Amino acid sequence: MHLVSSLLVVGAAFQAVLGLPDPLHEKRHSDIIKRSVDSYIQTETPIAQKNLLCNIGASGCRASGAASGVVVASPSKSSPDYWYTWTRDAALVTKLIVDEFTNDYNTTLQNTIQAYAAAQAKLQGVSNPSGSLSNGAGLGEPKFMVDLQQFTGAWGRPQRDGPPLRAIALIGYGKWLVSNGYADTAKSIIWPIVKNDLAYTAQYWNNTGFDLWEEVNSSSFFTIAASHRALVEGSAFAKSVGSSCSACDAIAPQILCFQQSFWSNSGYIISNFVNYRSGKDINSVLTSIHNFDPAAGCDVNTFQPCSDRALANHKVVVDSMRFWGVNSGRTAGKAAAVGRYAEDVYYNGNPWYLATLAAAEQLYDAVYVWKKQGSITVTSTSLAFFKDLVPSVSTGTYSSSSSTYTAIINAVTTYADGFVDIVAQYTPSDGSLAEQFDKDSGAPLSATHLTWSYASFLSAAARRAGIVPPSWGAASANSLPGSCSASTVAGSYATATATSFPANLTPASTTVTPPTQTGCAADHEVLVTFNEKVTTSYGQTVKVVGSIAALGNWAPASGVTLSAKQYSSSNPLWSTTIALPQGTSFKYKYVVVNSDGSVKWENDPDRSYAVGTDCASTATLDDTWR
């Protein structure tokens, strides 16, 4: 026995010298981490669930004064003041609630979702510094007072992720309603709210705005990806309630095409197009988990969590933040505390609970898909990620019967658990989750009881348990057009007035077949393209105005601006596309707006047009200035 023990010690010493992994040590380490995370999740889950609901008005224990259905970012009212409702945060939190509800029916969660829907219907109509509902611009306002009044202070506005994220959250509940026999309720209450947000997304997706961290006015990977998903899922949802979204179908492929431009040849996602940051940002990891579709495999174009690009990016983002004190000794391949981005200076730049949990969640998503498909593919793009965890791995596809497959599954799962274990280490004894924890001491920092932190924990815990959200249709919406186009569609907007849900919306006892739509929907919209040839000078713009709200009710300030992207001296073409309900009759004219704001109208008479009722999806008006 003594001799055998000595040989084992010598063998271990040789492994240490040669840098080879010790399988027994690795298994002990993973078992310890797993038990630690198991215990933390068991303890933290009821705390997180309770504290999340506490931040939702009007009955939440920390939401006194907030309107019904309002998701408060944090009860913190000073240093920092987060006593507001952000459209983005509220949507992400509600999406978590919807996912929990659809997985396990719960009347408390259902009431919370319905109150949220009613609050958002009202909020869409609140005019604010970003604009109003008349042309959709007001939907891009990032935050409001907790009593649903506008916030008029200086802020990074607009932020264009709010509308698509809200649409995604509400579509989740709408799909549950349809699948349980309540399509009429989904159409009368959920669809009008969602329709406004989809119209905003199709109209404004190509305009820059502030990103989810509210600091950079640029195109954002997170916003673009959310916009694509919303239009894809929105089109399918529209059909399920007997409606349609022509703008969704026309614009979604162009957004996905643009999304590919965020991938850097250096092997990571550039989260924002600015020249004063590296672009290595948890923004991209959050994108991957919030656009996770368990039926899409490891699709590259939608940057699914197990795609080679998403995994390569995960490594780069995590590695970029290993310099913090709390990450001392946490070398590549070991879980680390993660923040927003390495250059962050907010509160001097620190790890965030939600960011560290997002790093774990992406890996849990990947493991789920690998197990489902029974194989793992390692490419040259993702090789560095895998080598950190399984040094002997090489490019290739490994089936579930191979030892390499098993080694990867075990290593990635342990790696994911490591991120949760870090969160556990820096969670106070009462289970409260703030926004950040100090990069050196690990002490909680910034806003207390951050609602998004609790949602992030619950989401990561669910994925670890193999509980995943329904598919959003990524597998059938991942094809890229031959060339990218920055096309947009101006939308029509209307206040969602129906906000009272029927009682007893319980799960169906039998499978419900959604209604089959014949012909086109009664509210079918046609994409009407206005082409106007007019010679203009630098600084001038062209608008179309007319007798309907979508054309500004004859007010030039509210008219629709045409694009000059096809303009040339030989073909002075200005153009725009507007989604208009079939059968709509209207009069219209074009105006030239000078740089000083003065307006020149074209000559009489008024032009007139009636949108067809033949279920066509497009129509074109070719006009010349007169």
Swiss-Prot record:
Task: Look up the EC number in the record and give it.
Answer: 3.2.1.3
From the UniProt record, list the reaction(s) this protein catalyses: Hydrolysis of terminal (1->4)-linked alpha-D-glucose residues successively from non-reducing ends of the chains with release of beta-D-glucose
Locate the active site: D211 (proton acceptor), E214 (proton donor)
Any GO molecular function? starch binding
CDD domains, from UniProt? Answer: CBM20_glucoamylase (cd05811)
Q: Which residues form the propeptide?
A: 20-35
Q: What class of enzyme is it?
A: hydrolase
Instruction: Please give a single GO biological process term from the UniProt record.
Output: polysaccharide catabolic process
Q: Please name the InterPro entries in this protein's record.
A: 6-hairpin_glycosidase_sf, 6hp_glycosidase-like_sf, Carb-bd-like_fold, CBM20, CBM20_glucoamylase, GH15-like, Glucoamylase, Glucoamylase_active_site
Glycosylated sites? N106, N206, N217
**What's a GO cellular component annotated to this UniProt protein?**
fungal-type vacuole
- State the name under which the record lists this protein: Glucoamylase
Q: Which organism is it from?
A: Neurospora crassa (strain ATCC 24698 / 74-OR23-1A / CBS 708.71 / DSM 1257 / FGSC 987)
Name of encoding gene: gla-1
